[in-house]
Structure formats: C-alpha cells, structure tokens
Amino acid sequence: MASSLAAQLAQIAANSRTSLNAKALKATHSKSLIWEPRVAAGQTFAEIYQLSYEGFEELCNLDARFAQYGASLFSEQSQEADRIQMNAEENAVLDKRVDSFLHLVGSRLRLMPAIKAIEWLIRRFRSLTAPPRAAIVQQATNRPELLSVISQYTLESCRARQEYPGLVSFWGGVMAEAANGMLDKMRSGRRSIQLENDHILLQQIGPVLSEAMVMKEVPGIQIASYMIVTILAAKGSLNDVALTAFMDQLVHGWNIDTYRPGLVCLCILAQHRAAKQVSSRIAKALIKVQDLVPTLVEISRQHRVDKLANGLALAFIERLSKKGDVRSLPAINSLLSANLLRDKQIKVIYKSMLLAAHKVNDEVDEDGHIRKEIGSSLISLSQTGGDVGDVIRSAIEEVDFNIEELELKLGAAIRPKLAIEQSSEEAGAEEGAMAVENTLSLASTFQELAKLQPSTVSCLSQDSSGLFNDLCAVLLSAAAAESDMEKFDSIPALSRPLATSNPFYLSFYMRVWCGPFPTLAKVAALERVKLRLKESDCADKDFQAIIPYCAVALSDPAKKVRRAAADLIAVLGSLVKEQTRQVWGAKDLYGKVGAPNALDRDTLKALVSSVLVPSLEESVLHEAHVVAVLVSALESSKGSSGTEGGRRHLSHATRLSIFKFICGHVTETPLLAVKIRLLRSLNQIRSISGTSRTDLLLPLLRWWAALGHEEVIELTARESLDEATVDQAVVDVIIANHAAGLETAFELINDPKTALRPHLVQAIFCRVIKMWPSMKSDTKSSTARFMFNITQTLSSSEHGPVITEAVELLRKVELTTDIQLDLIDSLQDQVKLATEKPANKRRRVSTTEQSRSVGLQSNPELKAALNKTTFVLELVQESDPANHPELLPSLFTTLSDLHHLSTLIGSELGYLQNLVLSSLLAMMPAYKDNKNLTIDASVGHGDILATCIQKSSSPAVINAALLLVASLARTAPDVVLQSVMPIFTFMGSSEVIPPLIDTFRRRGRNVVASTKDLLASFVTAYEHIPSHRKHDLFISLVQNLGPEDFLFAILAMFVDRYAATDNMISFTTQMMSSFSVEIQLQTLIKLLDLTSDIFKPKPSLSNVLLGGDGSEHDTQKVATKQLNLLPHLLANKRLKREITQLAERDDMETGKIRDLYATLLESILTLATTVKNKKALYNRCGDALSNLLNLLSIAEFIKSVEALLDRPNVGLRQKVLRALELRVDSESTADPRSREALLAFLPQLTAVIRESDDMSYKHTAVTCVDKISEKYGKKDLDAVAAAAATIAGDYCLGQSSQTLRVMALLCLASLVDVLQDGIVPVLPVAIPKALDYLEQSLVGEEPNAELHNAAYAFVAALAQHIPYMITGSYLDRLLACSNASAAAALDDESSSNRTHCLQFLAKLVDPKVMYNALNQNWASASSCGASAVSEYLDILGMALDKHSKAAVAKNVASLSTIFLSAMDLRRTVVSGQAKTAISPSELGEIETKIGDDALKMIYKLNDAAFRPIFSKLMEWASTGLPKNDASGRTLRLFAVYGFLDTFFGNLKSIVTSYASYIVESAVQVLSSTNFQDADEKELWKWVLRTLGKCFEHDQDGFWQAPAHFGAVAPVLVEQFLNAGAADATEDLIPALVELAAAADSQEHHKELNGTLLKHLRNGQAAVRLAVVQCQQALTVRLGEEWLQALPEMLPYISELQDDDDEVVERENRRWIVEIEEKLGESLDSMLQ
C-alpha cells in the first residue's frame, strides 16, 4: 500500500508545475537580465513591474505597434498572472502573446527600454534565455524539426517586416552550419543512398531557401540563403534539376541590392552543373542586368565563371533564333571577347550562332533586320584579333563556312528573288544573264502578250490550263518589280477593264494565289485583285464567289500571303455593305457552270462581317485559325454565342446556306488545293439542320473515285499535293450511320477499279475504322458482316489489297458481343454444310475410314469452312474474350463441332482447339467476379474438356484444358464435378505421366519447365480436393513424377499460389517429412536455386514456374513468398531429429548428409548476398540461416563446413566463417561440447590469419576469434594468448588493410579484457603499432574515423585494466595525437571515443606521469587550436578532480608551469607565435576553463603551498617580459586579471589578504592605461572588476588600513578624468562604491568625497556626469553615513543646478532626489 501511494505521489510530482521547494522558487525568481541574483531575489513583482512599465512606455513612444500589449502583457492585472495557476489553454495563449512581443522587440534588444520590458517577461512569465549557440547548431543538425522552427520564426519576422541584422545573421549562421553538418552526416559511399539522402535534405530545407531567396524587401536574408545554397552545391551531390531550380528561384527574387552576390552564387551553382545552356528565365533576367559582362569579368578573378558564361551565351542564341531578341547580340559578343570562356566553349557558341543564322525565318524576322545584325556580329567576331579570333577562325574552317556567302544569305532582298527564280517553270534564262537583257526580254514578252486574246471565259474552267500556264510564267518573272507588274496587269489578254462582267481577270489571280507558286507571286495576285475591287465599277457587283478562295489564302503557310488575303477580305467586307444585286461569275465562273448556291445579301453579310472580318488578325498570325473560325461559325453555337464580341449568332438557315455555298464551290472548283483546304473545315461539320456533309459532298467522292490512277497522279503532281492526303480528305466526307455514304464506300470497295488505287482503298478503310465508335449497333453489325463477307468471297488475286484491309479492319475495331455471336453461329452452318453429303454419295465414297478422310480433306467446301473457322476464332481471341463472357456456350459448341470435324478429317485440329480453350480460359475471371453470369451444368462441358485431355496428343491443348478445368472448379464446380477426378486419376496413372516425362527427357528438355502447366493444374485444384485425400493424392503425384526432380517445384508453386499461410506451411511440411533426409536437403537446395534464379537478368525456371511481369516489385513479391516458407521447412523438428541421429552414426550416409548440408549453407549465403539490398528478403534469409545453423550441433557444423573452408573461393570461405560467427552468438556458455569444439577451432582461425592473403577473409577470421574469445576465452587463456600474439603481429595488425587494422585493434581491446595481465607480452609490439595507426588516421584531408576509434578503444582498454603499461613516452604520443584529433573536427562518435579514453587516462594513470605528460604536451595542444586546448583543459581538470590533495601537492611544480603557460596563451596567439589562430571568443572560453582548473588545484593546496605560486604568478605577469614588450605585458596581465576576477569572486573573503600582491600592479595599470589601445582599455576594466571583487568581499578590514586604502583610493578617483574615454558606470563607479563600503571610515569617506567634489568643477561634462552618478550610487549604498559630508556637497550641488550640460543637470536633480529620500526632508531651503 505504501509503495503504491509513493508511486502515485511521484507521478503527481512529475506532472505538477508547482514546486514546494523554497530554494528552487527563489532561484527561479532570481533570474534577471538587469540585477545580480542576490538583488533580484529580494525584489517584489510590483517593483519589477514599475521599472519594466517605464521601459514599455518608452518603447510605445518609439513604435506605436507596441501599444497593443499594454492591455495584456503590461497591464495592471499582469502582476497577478501566475503560470502555475493557469491551465494549459491559458498558458498557450500567454505563450503566443509573449512570442508575438518578442518578434516585434527583437530589433531593439540593445536598447535599455527593451531590456526593461523583457525583464518583466522573464520575471513574471518565466520566458527564460535561449540555450548556447553550439547546442542550437548541434540540435538543428540532428533534429530537422528544430531547424524548421527557427527558419519559420525568421521568415515570419521577415514577412511582417520585423527583421533585424542580428536575427538574419543568427539564422544564416545556424542554417549554414546545420546544412553543412547534415551533409556530412548524410554522406554515403553508395550512389543510390546518397541520392536519397540529398533528396531528403532538399525536402527539409529546400522550401525555406526557396522562400528566403524571393524576399526582395529583406536583402540580408537573400544573401544568407545564397551562402547556404552555395554550401549545398559544393558539398551535396545535387542533380542538374535541383541546381537549375535554385538558379531560377535566385534570379526570380534578386534586386538591385542583391544581384551582385546573387551573380556570384549563380557562377558557383553553374560550375557544379552540367555544361549546358541556362533556362529561359535565367537568360531573361540576366539580359536586363547592367554591365553584365564587366561584372562577370570582375567575379572571374575570384571564381570560375566559364560554365555560366557558356550556358548564358547558348541561351541568348536560342532567344535570338526563336524570338528574334537582338538585345542579346552585344552580350554574346562581349562574352566571347572577354576571355571568360575556354577554346572549346568559344567554338560551340560560334557554331551555334551560325546555326541560328540559318534558322531565322520570315516569321521571326519579317524585314530582315535580325539577319543583318547576326551577319554583322559573325563577321566582326571572325575578324577579332588575339586568341579568341584564332579560335573563331578555326571554328569557321571546321564547318567550311564562307563569310561572303553568309552575307548573301542574310540579305533582306535576296530570298524573295531566289524564290521566284526557283519556283518559275519558265525560268529558262542562263544564270549569268545581265539585268539589262532580262529587262529587254520581259519587254518583248509583254509585246507578244499584247497580241494574245483569251480563249476561255474563266481560268477556273477545265480547258484553261494552256493559257493560264503561259500567263503565269510571265507573272512569275514580273512579280519582282512593281513597274513590271503594272505592265503585266494591263495586257489585253487579262481583260482587266472587263473584270466585273468577264471572270477571266479575277479567276486568273484566284488560281495563282491558290496554286503552288512563290509567296511573292501569291501576294502580287492578291494585291492586284484588291486594287481592282476598289475601283468604282465594282460597287454594284456581288463578288461572293471570291470568298472561298480568300479563305484558302488565309490558310496559306506564308504569313505575307495571309496578310494580303486579310486585306482583300476587308475590301470585300466594304463592298458587302452596299446594296449589291448582280452576282459576279454566276453563269460562267467554272466555264459552262456558274458559281453554285449563291448567298442572299444578309447571309453574305453575316459570313463576311460576322465570321471572317473579326478573325482576320488571328488568321494572319496562325494559318489554321480560319479553319477553326469556319467550324465554329457553322457548328451549333448554343454554348459559344457570346464568346467573341465581334461575332453574332448565326441562324440555322444562314449556317445551312453558307454550308451549301462552300460545299458547292468545293465540288465545282478544278483546283485540288482549294478542295483540300476547304475540306479541313467542312469535314469537321457533321450536319446542319438535317443536311449532312455527305449529302452535299458525295458527288465529290464519286468524281474522285472515278478518276484513273494516271489522272490522279497528274492532278496531284500539277498542284504539288500528296495523293494519300487528297484521298483521305475526300473520303472523310462520309459520316457514320449515313446509309448512302456507307453504300458508296462499300460499292467502291467492291469495284475492281478501286483496287488499282491502293491509297484510296486504305483511306476508305481508315475512315470506317475512325467512324466505328460512332456507329449504331445495327450499322456496326451490317458493316462487320460486309467486311467478313469480303474476306470470304472476293478473289485474293483481284482484290488482294481490299481483302487485306478488311482483315485488318476486323482485327482493329472493337467487335461487339452480338457480332461475334453472329460470326460463331455462322460457323456451325458452314461446318454442317461442309460435312454432310447425300446418303447415297456418302455410302459410295466411304468404303473405308481412310478413304473417307482423304475425300473430306480434298473437299474445297471443307477447306473453306476450316479457313473461316480459323479466322473467326482468331478474331474472338483477339477481341479480349474476358469482356464477352456471353460467348462461352457458343464456344463450347464450337469446340464440340471441332471434335466431330477432327474425327472426320483425321486431324486433331490442335491449333483451333487451343484458340477456343484459350478464349474460354480468358472468360473465367468474368464468371468468377459476376454472380449474374452462370454456366449450365447440364450441357456436359466437363465431358468435352475430358475428351480434349484424354484424346489430344497436343501438349498445348492438354495444358489449356487442364487450366480450364481448374478454373471451372473454382468458378462452377458442378460443371466439372463428374469429370475432374477422372482427369486426375487418368493423369496420375502410370499410363501417361511416366511416358510424358520420358519423352521430355529424351528430347533434352527441362522436365519441370515442360510440365509446369500440368503441375499448375494440380496446385490450382488443391482447394477443391477433399481434405482427407489431399495428402495421399499429392504424395502419390510426387512419387510418380519423381521427388528428386519435382518435390521442390510442387512446394514452390503451392506457396506462390496460396502464400505461406499456417495451413499451407503445415501441408508442405508434412509432404517434406514423407521423404528421406537426403531428398529433403536436395529439395531445399533446389528451392534456393529457384529463388536465386528469380534475381538473374534473364530468369529461366523461375519465370516458367512462378511467372511474374519482370518488374522489381513483382520479383520481390514472388521471392518473398518462397523465402517465407524456407525457415519453416528448416525448423521442422522431425528433420532436426533425423539429422542428429544420422550424425551419431558417422558412416558414409552421414558424410553425404554433411556434404548436402554444406551445399545448402553455401546456397543460403549466396542468396543472402544477392538480396542484401532488399531488407525484407535479407531478413528472411537470415531466419533461414539461423534455423539451418541450429540443425546441427556446433561440432557437427564445423565438420560439415570443413570442406567449404578448403574451397579456393575465398568469398565462400569468408561467408562460412560469418555463419560460424552467427552460430557462436547463439551458443550457450554452459555447453561444454560447444566450448571444446570452438576453442579447438581457434588454432585453425589463427592459421587462416597467418596464411591467407585475402584481407576480408582475415577480417572475418579475426571477428570469429573475437567472438569465441569473448564468450569462452577465460577457459583457455593459452589459446587466447596465442591468438592475441598472432593478431598483434605482422600477419594481422601489421597488414596494410585499414579495415583489418581496425578489426585487429578492436579484437585486441576485447582480448585485454579477457587476458588482462596475460596480454603484457604482446603489448611491446601492439602499442607502438596502435599509436602509429592513430597518427596515420589523422593524416590527410579525410581522417580515418574507424581506425581512429579502434586505436582509442584499444588504449582505453589498456588504461582501464593495466594502466601501468602506459608509460610517459606512450602517453606523450597519445596526447599529441589527441590534440590533432581534437583539431580535426571529427564526428561525434570519434570525439566521444577520444574523450572516453582520455578520461580513463586522467583517472587511472599515475598522477606524476600524467601531470608531466600534460606539462610537456601544452605546446602541442596550443599549436592545434582552440578545440585541442579546450579538451586539454578538460582532461587537466579531471586529473585534478580524481587525484588526492597529496598527489596534487607533490606535482605542484608541473601544475604551476602548466598554468603559467596557459595564461600566456593570449599573448602568444595575438603576437602570432601560435601556429593556429584562435578567435577572441574562443580565447575567452579557454581562459574561463583555465580559471576553473586553477581553482580545482587551489582547492587541493594549503596556503603555504599556494602563496608562493600566487606571488610568482604576479611577478611573472608584471616583470616576466622585457620592458619594451608593453603589448605582451598587457595581454599577459589581461589573462591574469581574468583569473584573479574568478579567484576573488569564488574564494571571496578567504583570500582578501592576497590582494596585497596585486595592489602595485593594479595601480600601475590604472595609472598608465592608454585608452586608444583596445587591449589596454579592456585590461583597465578587468583591473577595476577585480578590485571591485576584492573590496566587496573584504570582511577583515583589509582595505581600512591606510596603507592599502591610500595606495588605491587616489588612483581610483583619478580615473574619473578618463570618463570621456571610458564608461565609468560599468566598472569604475561600482569599484569605488565597494571601496567606500569596505573602508567604512569617516576619514576615508571624507577623503574620497573631497577628491570627488573637486572633479565636479572639471571642464569636461563627461567627468562631471560620471562623478554625479558616482555620488548617486554612494548615496544609495551608504545613505546617511555618506551624507554626513552634505554641507561640503551643497555648494557643488547648487552649481550643478545651472550646469551647461543638460544631462549633468538632470542627473544632479536625481542626486538631489536620492538625498531627499535618504534624509526625509527637502534640500530646497539648503540650496537657497
């Protein structure tokens, strides 16, 4: 009961926030920012609140945002707030307010009002100080959540604009150190793990850096993030994706203040990135930077910039070629000329410029300006002098480039001229003809044309080609000059004046701009028509027939053509606005036929004004836009009527009129290009108001299909079109479910002429395939029936391509269940007709069975039936039978018909039967998943399958039938209930299985792989076999098959299918136990071989037996199932018992079992090596190995593996020893047989260590020795000692392998524990080598931590058990190594091992040896830096702690020398005598430790022993250096007075008398201080602090003595004259106040007061102010005792009331207030 109550009380105390410990409460209350703890402990909350509220009010005056906290944290009620009384929710709210206040006040932490306000938070709300920086960094490195909290705090402050340099500097430093530490911690030698670690690190700190880099208002945090990103790039293995992301984010967020450091960061990131162009975002940002190249040149003096410059230049070139950004050209030129790039990079960039020059086209450079600029740059760069010019010229030679040719190619006027000359068919003039001759030739041509009269009404008629070609040739020659074009336009043959009534003029130009002619000619044609339509005689005409051709021009690839077409449409739009009536070309536009389906005025206006004109600008930009516009206008616009403001909704009638209008022109125009381009839009319109495109365009398809092959070739060649493209466009006019269209398509397919045009045939079938998903069910059925009939009825010689396409169509489209049923049902009639003949004829032919079979085989009808059946069944199999389970009854019927047919023709028809069976098998999952699908059990499907199995000789058919039976057994057991067991009985008998196996063996095939499907059928049927028959049935099966070959396969397939469940483990274990031990071990070996086969690049047997898709996940899943079974099989108690019995017999059979055991062990070890990277599988191998090792006793195990240890394969021998190591771990220490066997094996292990040359093998042997010795070593010390000698010798510890050395040292450390004094003979060899290796481990850039730790472990064991063996010379070397180790900044584990060892040494080694070694080692420690010195002092302190007073007193000489050297450290460091620099902060920490260690020594000395040391110290500090070394003396005194401050502060009144030794020195320092020297000024402060401590703790009247008081007091008062150079309030005033309190004499007070009052009339305001503040402090501290001299003070006080300095005057008033408070009366009357 009492214990229960105590436990409850302990739990309550642990969870309680209330403490009843008065000392603890007082200590908590005394924590203050402002006051000493002893002062703070006596303060009330009201006093603290009053002072803190004053500071809060001042903060509110500085920043109004603080006012909000006046009602919460600084309210009157806050004095009553007590965290102990608050609940968790209230404390959380309070924490949130405190955190918010600290965010805001953070930037003002150095202001006194802020300190006062925070004082209230600390005292009232217990908001304590933060942990030291080193702890923060260490925790942030190891705990990412802390780093995240610090980062979020900093980012929140920055978002709220509450940041300040201290916060940003703190975050940047911690983040940088933490990132560096995390990179070191996550470093791995394996690439995959390293990549994963880098990914994790980026996930942890990447988002923080990403946000920090874009805080443009906080440049400091951006620069800090640049530093951290640089560390990540330099030390982390970041890929290019991450580096590019950081670079993009950097340029996204930089500004004018951060672009320079950002550019440096970019350079560093680029150097760690692959040499490729930077992203477009970076290029876009850098192109805006002023003086980019000069800045890069400046940066290149300190950092490599070549990769950034290279990537930037390539990105600029890409922008130039794709976007025409010529701003980047000067930057590219400057980068190439600035010597920032290597020769290879210069070549690549220049060649890229050449390529860009050729890529720039009219879309990027319409006026040729960009090409001219590029050409100028290329030429100027090629003429550059120096090395850069040489490299560029060599690049030009490599690409065989001609600068003059480039000038020509980049000229703006060259390309159009060349295009005209190359495109004209009549350009027959010689290449060297002069321009004058060309002009004369063109003039004569015009004269000839003037006599020519048009022979046709329109150039769009069928008979206009000759005249059009002649005129077109002249046009192409005249298009280059406007004057020539004017002459051409006016020739009589064109009939320009008659253009409104005669369509020849306009139709000529229409045909030109729609034809395959140069861009300039098309533009000229469009311009001519535009100018003509602007004339007055065109105002009363309706030129709607031109609109389709304008739409064609709007889809031209050339932008100039589209622009000219847009201008022409705009003119047409202006004509439409007029009241026009007469339609141009209405009668003769196409010769005898006029323009079809003319539009009325409103429809025309809607087409032009609402459809075409609003989209002209977009159509000019994109050639496909006009197609989309027409489709959008013609389609039903319910949802798009308001999408574009410039277009209005078109009515059904309007859209139908436009649709018919365009279709009419498509049908009538002779130009294929016009047809094709307009069909792009029309073929996207299904129908309008019931009128489909097929209705209107079917004549076009018939016309095109009626053309002969030669005519098609001629037409397409004339217009430079692809025949297949035209075929497809024309055929696409057919829509799904259109009866006439489909009928036309079917007629064309059946037409023999169509077969001569394969492209057209292919287009028709492609169209049917495309329409198939949109067809109705009956249409699909009729189409499929038609296609199927084609494949069966047409002649392959005449319609070969058609039949091929029909077959492909049926294979590609998704055949519905009804279609497939129709096809299958047609087979039954076909087979019936083919096999049944009239009775008399059948009797006449079938005289014998053989003759009947021959007759049927020669029957063409039967052959056709077989072909048809084959095709149908292939279609069914390819149509995913799983989705058509309704076919199952028909397929079973077909299978039955095939059996009947096979008996007639004398062939098994195995292929056809296999098709049916595979389709049926695919349907089984559907019947299993869908309960609505049922199989009729009365039909006899099982009998059919049994027939397949029993009568077929095809293995494929038998296997498929067995699989189907197994599936039916799971899905519909009733179907095969009567048939499945006869099948098993039949297959299990000796009539089939043995012959089958023999056949496979004779053919040299793998019998297991060949019978895989057979085995699978039995495994599948396992769950349907009665439980009482399962064991016997499968035992019989395995015995018939042969257990040595098939038992492992059965087991593997069982566990693969049903997993290693409890039932399956029990069943398989029973099966295994039914066979001999030899068979069981062989089976286990083969199981392991099968599992190993899974992981081969090309699995063989495992892929056959276990399947799998080859993926990593699937492979691991399959292997896991197998390895889950293996440990259970090995754990079989019966197997272990039988093996144990055999081992006791020790005969030949036992030897065979040992061999199999060794092979099994080898297989497990090999497999474990294979799956080492897969944790789950590796663990399963470990379980199996554990169970295998337990099968034999350790003695038998060693006998079994002896053969393996004799193998030449060193890797195998090493694995065997590792297995032995595992077995040793599991052995009991109490088993004598195991102990004897293992100790007897030690000599063999030492022999391995001596004789083997393989280091890994030696390493494993040493590990085994370590394990055996640790467990059994104390039972046979001689054997262990022999092993220790071997390990310490040259064969092991003396080897060059680092890992072996590490293991040897660790093993020796264990052997020291076992042997203790018995290992002494080995140590003269082992200790020097250990120290040598320790020294080697610290040499080089990367210290060897493992060797380092092992050496320290060995030495630590020696120090713990036999410390007397560590002599002075060994200790000197060890301490020197420890200094180097401390300076090397190793990981935590290494540092812990080192300090652990040194702690043992400090505690256990003889003190004289230890202190002498430390004395001799000081120089080494100080030369290694702060870390080594700090650790040195820690060890010294521990050595002082652990040894007695007598030991310390005996070695005081060595210790005093150590402390004198230590106190001289500051001087040696500052003067540069130290080899390693130590920062001032580190020096401060070291001197604090020196003081602490000195106190530890002092505590163990008496006064008689220590006083001479103290005297010597002061003498050494004051006179130990030459007189001319003033700075050295100052630094030495600095350290000494730092110690004295600690000395007097800790020992207090005990050592007051020691102050007599420092008076002279202190007076000298105070009298001679040069305040311009920072060191002397700081020493001055230390002296005052030390004196203050002496005065404060004087309890013996030491300073009342006139000699002591008189020596110090005048000098102290004289220091007020230095108030202008130093702050008197910090140290001087407290010291003087303490002196006055210690003096405690009226005479001394009068002397002090008189001297101080004299300084009140000093001319310096700072002196007067300091004295007034000193008087205030004296008044407060001494009260009336000091105010006895008030009469002397009053005149001075009165004078100070009118002082020239306001501050002095204000402080004087405060002094008066203090006096009045002490006296209790006013001074006004006295001062008057």
UniProtKB/Swiss-Prot annotation:
Its main location: nucleus. GO terms for cellular component: 90S preribosome; small-subunit processome; t-UTP complex. It comes from the Eukaryota. One of its GO terms (molecular function) is snoRNA binding. HEAT repeats lie at residues 540-578, 881-926, 986-1024, 1191-1229, 1235-1274, 1622-1662, 1683-1721. One of its GO terms (biological process) is maturation of SSU-rRNA from tricistronic rRNA transcript (SSU-rRNA, 5.8S rRNA, LSU-rRNA). The keyword Nucleus applies. It is found in: Nucleus, Nucleolus. InterPro entries: ARM-like (IPR011989), ARM-type_fold (IPR016024), BP28_C_dom (IPR012954), HEAT_Utp10/HEAT1 (IPR056473), U3snoRNP10_N (IPR022125), UTP10 (IPR040191). The keyword Iron does not apply. Belongs to the HEATR1/UTP10 family. Involved in nucleolar processing of pre-18S ribosomal RNA. Involved in ribosome biosynthesis. Component of the ribosomal small subunit (SSU) processome. This is U3 small nucleolar RNA-associated protein 10. The lineage of its organism: Eukaryota, Fungi, Dikarya, Ascomycota, Pezizomycotina.
